[in-house]
Amino acid sequence: FEQKSQTEKEDFLFFVSLAVVSSDTNVVVANIVSEKIKIIPFDEEMVDSVIGNFRIKYRIYENEDRLPMTNPPKGEKVYYAGSDIELAVDYNEKNVLNGLIKKDYFKDYFFGYGIDITQYGISSLRILSVENEVLILELQICVPDTDLCCYFILKIDNEGLMKVEELFDDFESD
């Protein structure tokens, strides 16, 4: 994976105020108001680790998704950058899985609870263990800066087949 430098910054987008005037009547027919939008970047994470007979490499990086802040400061629109995961798994030094993990892969789990997945983003991935030649990972998908999360267990066998299990969620208590 390529390592991309991540700077401590916040992106700002500005829309310019514009009034459209009819040339026939000199009447304003449209008015576009200026607006400041703040985008909080995602901090990229890279892991390259060996556990048992598995080598796992993954990179969690910022994508083009924009997740709205639940309680932005008054008069501001604030978004968090979303993320995707590049994942590569080797077993006994042979590559068995290369893939991209996107939050949309999990939308059916959210649909069952009537939850709008557009507010959620991939938060983290961590290596848990290896059991019976199966690599076990935990994936967390959350609404940024809240405790609304859904956890998934990803089980990857020595042939690269992945099984997804919902581990725990906050939806059932709602």
What does each of the following model-derived ranges do?
Residues 108-147:
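Acidic, glycine-rich flexible loop segments
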